């Protein structure tokens, strides 16, 4: 009160001045209260917005399962137990001895595997072999794929290899994913035992369909519109399954789909899904061909199952053109600029308007505007009812792998049969 009188130069007997003083206080106090309220409101709004952005980075658009938190597989033992082994103080042998009980149900006795192993290629973890597994009936051995861990392997490599096996345990079985038959992990060398999908990858199948060949090894090498939908539906079922597990694939393409003789499709190449499972995100060190990536992936933004939907549209293009590279007129390094201009691929001459409409829905710029895998599957199931199952897709030109690799932006070596489950 004294300071206010001093500012207004009031005397105690000056009633008019005292009135002015009180009016001044009436103005100042509410103003201060309003200012403090606005500051607090601003801080609360800022905290709320920051939290919302954090949640958006952890999940995709509405209806998309959130990415699971990173998992430390070095401590997981299954059966509700933990393996508490500090890596710096543990040998490979001790680590295997501690983790093998957790994988007991998956162990395949090594004597059940044939002594002669046929090496078919090299994978990211080590050599990949084809072998026969004893099923109890000597007349019916089962052909399997052995993914070996390259030697010598350090403790971290062993931990990662076992983590991939644990990843299969988490996934469980699905008819449109390559199945884990078991493992051999009680001692070195370590093997992951997978089912053998002997017909190879879909891209090679599509290229063979271009040749004037009716059958080869009992498989009919031709493709109709209805069969394209049939294969696409199976891929979407696999993507739905991954979405239910709070995962996404990250590299949907014909080269990552294996085919059986009855045209059963099995999605493979789950290395990126494994990264999401263990780390909660995709590593920046993974190299994926740019022409299959959704815009948000090219812009290095958080990815989701809707990025797989974009790639699925590219897969439909691959099938209907019998394995042509996407965006043939665009250099791989210019694909982002091309897409930023809202340009998409034109309808191939062998593609119906119905199928092209489905493709375009996959290539919407905003991921929230794209259909979910389930919505896509329902559209494919509706299209199958009226699809042509008589006319065979025909492309007269044969594929030159070196030219394809240059246009597609991939390594030529990756075009050779590579059983890449993980």
From Swiss-Prot:
Enzyme class: transferase
UniProt KW Transferase keyword: yes
Parts of the chain that traverse the membrane: 26-46
Keyword annotations from UniProtKB, A to Z: ATP-binding, Kinase, Membrane, Nucleotide-binding, Proto-oncogene, Transferase, Transmembrane, Transmembrane helix, Tyrosine-protein kinase
Annotated residues for binding of ATP: 120-128, 147
Reactions mediated catalytically: L-tyrosyl-[protein] + ATP = O-phospho-L-tyrosyl-[protein] + ADP + H(+)
GO cellular component labels: plasma membrane
Protein kinase domain boundaries: 114-384
Compartment annotation: Membrane
Active-site residues, as the UniProt record annotates them: 251
The protein's Enzyme Commission number: 2.7.10.2
Gene Ontology MF terms in the entry: ATP binding; non-membrane spanning protein tyrosine kinase activity
Tissue-specificity statement: Widely expressed. Highly expressed in brain, placenta and prostate. Undetectable in most normal lung tissues, widely expressed in lung cancers.
Membrane topology term: Single-pass membrane protein
Membership in a protein family: Belongs to the protein kinase superfamily. Tyr protein kinase family.
Purpose: Probable tyrosine protein-kinase, which has strong transforming capabilities on a variety of cell lines. When overexpressed, it can also induce tumor cell invasion as well as metastasis in distant organs. May act by activating both MAP kinase and phosphatidylinositol 3'-kinases (PI3K) pathways.
PANTHER family: SERINE_THREONINE_TYROSINE KINASE 1 (PTHR24416:SF631), TYROSINE-PROTEIN KINASE RECEPTOR (PTHR24416)
Name this protein carries in UniProt: Tyrosine-protein kinase STYK1
Organism: Homo sapiens (Human)
Taxonomic placement: Eukaryota, Metazoa, Chordata, Craniata, Vertebrata
Gene of this entry: STYK1
């Amino acid at each position: 009160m004294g300071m206010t009188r001093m500012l207004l130069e009031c005397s105690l007997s000056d009633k008019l001045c005292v009135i002015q003083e009180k009016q001044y206080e009436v103005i100042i106090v509410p103003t201060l209260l309003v200012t403090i309220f606005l500051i607090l409101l601003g801080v609360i709004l800022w905290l709320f917005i920051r939290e919302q952005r954090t949640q958006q980075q952890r999940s995709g658009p509405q209806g998309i399962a959130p990415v699971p938190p990173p998992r430390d597989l070095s401590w997981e033992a299954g059966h509700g137990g933990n393996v508490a082994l500090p890596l710096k103080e543990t040998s490979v042998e001790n680590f295997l001895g501690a983790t093998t009980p957790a994988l007991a149900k998956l162990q395949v006795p090594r004597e059940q595997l044939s002594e002669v192993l046929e090496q078919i290629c090299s994978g990211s973890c080590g050599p990949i072999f084809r072998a026969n597994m004893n099923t109890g009936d000597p007349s019916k051995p089962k052909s399997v794929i052995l993914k070996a861990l390259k030697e010598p392997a350090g403790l971290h490599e062993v931990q990662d290899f076992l983590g991939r096996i644990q990843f299969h345990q988490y996934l469980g079985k699905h008819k449109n994913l390559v199945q884990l038959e078991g493992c051999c992990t009680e001692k070195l060398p370590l093997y992951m035992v997978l089912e053998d999908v002997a017909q190879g990858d879909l891209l090679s199948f599509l290229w063979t369909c271009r040749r004037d060949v009716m059958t080869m090894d009992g498989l009919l090498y031709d493709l109709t519109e209805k069969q394209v939908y049939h294969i696409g539906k199976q891929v979407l079922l696999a993507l739905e399954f991954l979405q239910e597990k709070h995962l996404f694939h990250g590299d949907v393409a014909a080269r990552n789909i294996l085919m059986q003789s009855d045209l059963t499709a099995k999605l493979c190449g789950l290395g990126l899904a494994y990264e999401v499972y263990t780390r909660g995100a995709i590593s920046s060190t993974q190299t994926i061909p740019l022409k299959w990536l959704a815009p948000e992936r090219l812009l290095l933004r958080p990815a989701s199952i809707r990025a797989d939907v974009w790639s699925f549209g590219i897969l439909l293009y691959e099938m209907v053109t019998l394995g042509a590279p996407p965006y043939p007129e665009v250099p791989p390094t210019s694909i982002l600029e091309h897409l930023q201009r809202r340009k998409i691929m034109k309808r191939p001459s062998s593609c119906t308007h119905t199928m092209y409409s489905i493709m375009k829905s996959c290539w919407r710029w905003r991921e929230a505007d794209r259909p979910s895998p389930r919505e896509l599957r329902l559209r494919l199931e509706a299209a199958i009812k009226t699809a042509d199952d008589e006319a065979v897709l025909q492309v007269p030109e044969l594929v030159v792998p070196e030219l394809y690799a240059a246009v597609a932006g991939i390594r030529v070596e990756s075009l050779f049969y590579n059983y890449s489950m993980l």
